[in-house]
């Protein structure tokens, strides 16, 4: 039997669709890992390669985030019109299974590791069900190593992606992670992770941990980082800003090869942080916190959500000044996006403030709700100005002109974001 896994592309002309550096979908490699060996599994990434709708694959499997969902449905229609069976999973489908079922033959709701073998067995016997939802999560100790061989020959910047934990103990209003995983924070055994890392470094010393919060449990993270010390790895992941308060853990991360962290500052307004549910973020300490990262050789890709009720047009120059004064190596400025399943969507729906459910525009670059502190035009123009200004050469010089070991990552990252923003503006 043959299976074709497809990662749908982002809408063209959007920032995330224009970035030249791309990472593979680890979730598809994880699904491949729980696929029985009698299946021949291949991958197609719609972002940069054509889809063969006349493939001889027996089963087509898609995953999608919300802005990719319309493209995923288009792809599904192309295959179903040729008599192929199409199944789909991912964050968007898990929150809107009925919508997906009008476009595909079956959906996987939630984590697919447990139910995937059963779905395949049902397909082979002609008894495919419409919805597959696990009764319990797979033990993290039982999750097999992702089948990264499906990435071979693809145009990816890095295929050394790995997941050590699932979930997040926090419950931020705008975040999809809790809606998908719940508030459980589950961890793979440290020994398993270290063994997998030993294999990964044979291909490349750079590793990206896709964990949503790799330091949520210091009793887990500390021995992990200590075990990684001396491996010669250079790695990136996600951590909250209050990671800076744990100097021992941060020092261990730096010594183990951490070059950078995606850090959700989210807002400079403490009232907005409280509304978001960012219970550990303290805006008054952000500057010192950023310095603590730098002191340990760890660069920051900061994230600041634009459009919360406390934001006014003054937020844009204020954010630029902060980012430059804090010398953040890189940053993104996503527009508040009320994704299906999130608490912020439920709140904005109750307030009658959702103005669009065109999923293509749920890309963190378009406004889909009525803001309070400014007009839609002011928010959109402020977003565009902030991105252009932050990734201008003068700003890049002010932020990263001093040599720092993380420049090997953040130098190219800044140039990549700058080029993508310019391509987006020119309509390339």
Predicted regions and their residues:
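Acidic, low-complexity intrinsically disordered segments
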Residues: 1-202
């Amino acid at each position: 039997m043959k299976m074709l896994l497809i990662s749908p592309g982002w809408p063209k002309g959007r920032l995330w669709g224009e970035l030249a550096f791309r990472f593979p979908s680890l979730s598809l490699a994880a699904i491949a890992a729980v696929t029985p060996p009698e299946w021949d599994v291949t991958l197609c990434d719609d972002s940069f390669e054509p889809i063969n709708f006349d493939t001889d694959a027996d089963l087509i499997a898609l995953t999608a985030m919300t802005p990719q969902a319309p493209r995923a449905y288009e792809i599904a229609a192309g295959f179903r019109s040729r008599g192929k069976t199409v199944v789909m999973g991912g964050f968007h489908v898990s929150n809107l299974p009925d919508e997906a079922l009008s476009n595909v033959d079956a959906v996987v709701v939630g984590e697919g590791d447990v139910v995937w073998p059963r779905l395949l067995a049902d397909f082979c016997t002609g008894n495919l069900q419409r919805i597959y939802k696990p009764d319990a999560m797979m033990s993290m100790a039982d999750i097999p190593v992702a089948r990264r061989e499906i990435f071979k020959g693809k145009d990816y910047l890095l295929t050394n992606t790995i997941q050590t934990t699932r979930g997040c103990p926090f419950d931020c209003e705008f975040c999809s992670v809790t809606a998908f995983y719940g508030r459980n924070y589950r961890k793979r055994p440290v020994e398993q992770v270290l063994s997998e890392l030993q294999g990964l470094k044979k291909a490349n010393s750079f590793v990206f941990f896709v964990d949503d919060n790799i330091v949520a449990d210091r009793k887990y993270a500390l021995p992990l980082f200590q075990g990684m010390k001396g491996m010669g790895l250079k790695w990136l992941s996600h951590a909250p800003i209050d990671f800076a308060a744990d100097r021992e853990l941060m020092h261990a991360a730096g010594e183990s090869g951490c070059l950078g962290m995606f850090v959700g500052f989210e807002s400079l307004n403490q009232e907005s942080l409280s509304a978001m549910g960012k219970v550990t973020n303290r805006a008054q300490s952000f500057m010192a916190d950023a310095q603590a990262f730098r002191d340990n050789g760890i660069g920051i890709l900061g994230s600041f959500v634009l459009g919360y009720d406390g934001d006014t047009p003054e937020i844009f120059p204020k954010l630029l000044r902060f980012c430059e004064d804090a010398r953040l190596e890189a940053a993104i400025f996503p527009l508040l996006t009320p994704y299906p399943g999130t608490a912020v969507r439920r709140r904005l729906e109750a307030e009658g403030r959702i103005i669009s459910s065109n999923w293509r525009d749920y890309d963190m670059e378009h406004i889909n709700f009525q803001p309070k502190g400014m007009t839609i035009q002011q928010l959109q123009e402020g977003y565009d100005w902030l991105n252009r200004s932050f990734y201008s050469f003068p700003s890049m010089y002010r932020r990263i002109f001093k040599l720092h070991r993380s420049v090997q990552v953040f130098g190219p990252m800044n140039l990549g974001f700058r080029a993508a923003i310019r391509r987006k503006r020119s309509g390339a």
